[in-house]
From Swiss-Prot:
CDD domains: GH55_beta13glucanase-like. PANTHER family: PECTATE LYASE SUPERFAMILY PROTEIN DOMAIN-CONTAINING PROTEIN-RELATED, POLYGALACTURONASE QRT3. It holds the Pfam family Pect-lyase_RHGA_epim. Residues 1-42 form the signal peptide. Its EC number is 3.2.1.58. Keywords: Cell wall biogenesis/degradation, Glycoprotein, Glycosidase, Hydrolase, Signal. It comes from Cochliobolus carbonum (Maize leaf spot fungus). Belongs to the glycosyl hydrolase 55 family. It is an enzyme of class 3 (hydrolase). The lineage of its organism: Eukaryota, Fungi, Dikarya, Ascomycota, Pezizomycotina. Glycans are attached at N28, N233, N381, N773. This is Glucan 1,3-beta-glucosidase. It catalyses: Successive hydrolysis of beta-D-glucose units from the non-reducing ends of (1->3)-beta-D-glucans, releasing alpha-glucose.
């Protein structure tokens, strides 16, 4: 949730926006069957497997049997010659097929689209308007160029949620804007006059979204008002592998929480302008030749600061006058705002490392900053609060989590060097993906064949229903098409006392690696004994899941929608018991890597016109029992016992992680309708703890959290407990949300909570009261240390 002024957000842009007409609940798109012969021609083979294997994806719950999932912009009239205006062709490709467009619907899972852009230069004179559940993907072998015409008048060349020119209403509620991607593009705005508004991408975004491998080029004129990426709202999100040059701002961004990794910005006046946030993790920034690398001064020290916290790690700043410009002080308003932690930062020719309210508080030069911060501290052993501004005892980084001294990371594989002969098609192997047929045997056969032949298994878009465990052996590589879904169904998953995985990655004791990307795993009907994903492999470096999400209920075909599971307080329906555990990384499954994953038990129906709330019951969230685990850009929401549990786990990197407590709690109280069991190291609940834990650290060691947000917005569906107008900012949806039990060497930086009275409970003792850490809306701790 975010309660902010739209005008304030737009004012922060400093750029005049061109809006588009408002059209409430009217769909003027074409039907997939109405294209003329030229537009309906087969996609041109261009050497990239995603394009060359296209055509078999299906949207099984779409009313149009001819609905096209994959669209090549050249099939819709785009020329890519750098001369012809291709704007309309892009918008036709995106909107074709009565899809979920701005103001038309809140969300939809039955009209996905991959919009593919072959190599070439595409002149753009009107904004490209994004639709729900869309992936705009260029050819990574030779990145296509989207070149802004000099006459372009728009909020952004790619607009993720346009504003109406009639009443200013955005196309979508940004905090519910899920399931979208932009990949493999060059956006060139250099033809636009420096003083004319230009932004490459407008991207209000939430979970299960990403921008990856995008280059943005803008004017380097001193009077430029251009910005590369503008984000003014949302509950995100993830970006990686960006390269931005020029402009007033490389990025002008604000969001509840976000993770950015491997971002290069050069020759902007301000590299990154943080408009507002609750918390943000930046890793691998390379900012050079800018006036200010990173600004977080919005609101100022005398007023109400808009930035909650920022954590910046493993980054390099070169030839900038200032690294960080901040407004924090001992008397910051609110007291928990403006917090900053920087760690392992290499400066080259940067005179001022950190400036606060115009004064240099950390000198620069050419040096490496180990760990430094400012804000509220609870250390050692969660004692506090105390204000701090200066060097702090940084985390002792376990060597197994590092590569060349930095936390290990790996970008999502796109297999751009492979030909089509290196792939196996799930549909071609006999799976239907129609959401009705039992595809268990066909899917298992395809998975086994691909691994044995060292090929990549391509799941064309569809819903692949399975009634037994799909075993994923070491060596597997699997990739989906705009979130192809595997759906577990049936009695195999029916006994919560004897849980069974839907997806089993390796068997206990096995070693090896896998790569899995761009897919969803979901359940159908009552499956109280389902472990949605079980990870067992003792893995080599680089084995993991990228953009793989779990969606439990809230979508067509799941039988877990409004009709079956209405949000009636106190009415607990067994047919809506949907999973024992969402994701389990088991003992011995060391080396697992997760990036940009959303493990979600649905709180509302994505295919309902009014996004109506539903009651779905999942026992446990993300359970980690292994060592050397990386968790980048992760969310776990609405599980009855806990969202995250790190149980006897060691050497864990997590950032940014985010949770929400089930909206219906404490009716029924946790752990109901599930039963706590010592077999799974479940929490024991009491009358003083009636809602789920956001994060539970049980006998864990060396847990490093670089940005986290644990949120509780409701009490029995009453949002009043988290109201922005709560007296004195006291938001009391639940008493406590973070439990540290028997754990050592725990450190957290930029840690926020919403709706919680006590932010930390360590060894059964409540610590860190909300009132001492009230930030821009949540409560925030800059530095937490325990168990040293």
């Amino acid at each position: 949730m975010r309660f902010s002024s739209l005008l304030a957000c737009l004012g922060a842009v400093g750029i005049q926006a061109a809006a588009i007409p408002f059209q409430r609940r009217v769909d003027n798109t074409t039907d997939s069957g109405s294209l003329d012969a030229a537009q309906a021609a087969a996609a041109i083979v261009d050497g990239y497997w995603l394009n060359d294997l296209s055509g078999k994806g299906r949207a099984p719950f779409n009313s149009n049997p001819n609905y096209k999932v994959f669209r090549n912009v050249k099939d819709y009239g785009a020329k890519g010659d750098g001369v012809t205006d291709d704007s309309d062709a892009f918008n036709r490709a995106i909107s074709d097929g009565s899809r979920c467009g701005p103001w038309v619907c809140d969300s939809s899972t039955d009209s996905p689209a991959v919009v593919y852009v072959p190599s070439g230069t595409y002149l753009i004179n009107k904004p490209i308007i994004f639709y729900y559940m869309t992936a705009l993907i260029g050819n990574p072998r030779e990145l296509p160029v989207l070149k802004a015409a000099s006459s372009l008048q728009a909020l952004a060349l790619i607009d993720g949620s346009p504003y109406s020119n009639q009443n200013g209403e955005p196309g979508w509620i940004s905090t519910n804007l899920f399931l979208r991607q932009i990949r493999n593009l060059i956006i060139d705005g250099t033809a636009v006059a420096p003083t004319s508004g230009f932004q490459a991408i407008h991207w209000p975004a939430s979970q299960a979204t990403t921008i990856q491998n995008v280059k943005i080029r803008m004017t380097q004129a001193s009077n430029s008002v251009h910005a590369g990426i503008f984000v003014e709202n949302g509950s995100g999100g993830h970006m990686a592998d960006l390269d931005i040059t020029g402009g007033l701002y490389g990025m002008n961004i604000g969001n509840q929480q976000f993770t950015m990794r491997n971002v290069k910005i050069s020759k902007a006046v301000v590299g990154i302008s943080q408009i507002w946030n609750w918390g943000w993790l930046y890793s691998g920034l390379q900012i050079s030749d800018c006036g200010t690398a990173f600004s977080m001064v919005n609101g100022g020290s005398a007023g109400k600061q808009e930035v909650g916290s920022a954590v910046i790690i493993d980054s390099e700043i070169t030839n900038c006058q200032k690294f960080v410009d901040s407004a924090w002080s001992q008397t910051s308003n609110p007291t928990g705002s403006g917090q900053l932690v920087i760690e392992n930062i290499k400066l080259t020719n940067v005179p001022a490392a950190v400036v606060s309210n115009g004064a240099t508080v950390l000198a620069g030069g050419s040096l490496t900053i180990q760990t430094w911060g400012q804000g509220n501290k609870y250390a050692p052993n969660a004692s506090g609060p105390s204000k701090f501004q200066g060097a702090i005892s940084g985390a002792t980084r376990p060597t197994g989590l590092l590569q060349n001294g930095k936390f290990y990371s790996k970008s999502k594989p796109q297999y751009e060097t492979l030909s089509t002969s290196s792939f196996i098609s799930a549909r071609g192997a006999g799976a239907t993906g129609d959401g009705v047929t039992d595809d268990t045997r066909a899917v298992q056969a395809a998975v086994t064949q691909a691994a044995s032949q060292n090929k990549v298994l391509f799941f064309e878009h569809g819903v692949y229903k399975v009634t037994n465990t799909i075993y994923v052996p070491p060596g597997s590589r699997m990739v989906g098409e705009i979130f192809s879904a595997i759906m577990g169904s049936g009695s195999t998953f029916g006994d919560q006392a004897n849980p069974v995985p839907i997806i089993q990655i390796g068997k206990p004791g096995e070693s090896g690696s896998i790569e899995w990307s761009d897919m969803i795993v979901q359940t159908q009907g009552a499956t109280p004994g389902a472990i949605v994903i079980q990870y067992n492999l003792n893995t080599a470096l680089g084995s993991g899941l990228w953009d793989v999400h779990t969606r439990i209920g809230g979508a067509k075909g799941t039988n877990l929608q409004v009709a079956q599971c209405p949000a009636v307080l106190g009415q607990v329906k067994p047919e809506c018991f949907s999973a024992h555990t969402n994701v389990h990384v088991t003992k011995g499954a060391n080396g697992a890597y997760f990036e940009n994953n959303w493990f979600w038990t649905a709180d509302h129906d994505l295919d309902d016109a009014d996004s109506t709330r539903i009651n779905i019951y999942t026992g446990r969230g993300f359970h980690v029992e292994a060592n050397n685990v990386w968790i980048w850009a992760n969310g776990a929401e609405h599980h009855t016992m806990y969202q995250y549990q790190f149980n006897a786990a060691q050497d864990i990197f997590a950032g940014y992680i985010q949770t929400e407590t089930p909206y219906f709690q404490p009716t029924p109280i946790a752990p109901l309708p599930y039963v706590s069991s010592s077999k799974y190291s479940d929490p024991v609940y009491s009358s003083s703890q009636t809602s789920a834990w956001g994060l539970r650290l049980l006998d864990a060691k060396n847990v490093l959290i670089y940005g986290g947000g644990l949120y509780s917005f409701f009490d029995n569906y009453d949002v009043g407990c988290s109201s922005p107008t709560a007296p004195n900012g006291f938001r009391d949806c639940q008493t406590r949300i973070l439990s540290i039990e028997g754990s050592t060497s725990v450190q957290a930086f930029g840690f926020s909570e919403v709706g919680v009275e006590w932010m930390v409970t360590a060894a059964g003792q409540d610590k860190a009261n909300w009132k001492d850490n009230l930030s821009v809306y949540p409560t925030t701790i800059g530095y937490l240390s325990y168990g040293f």
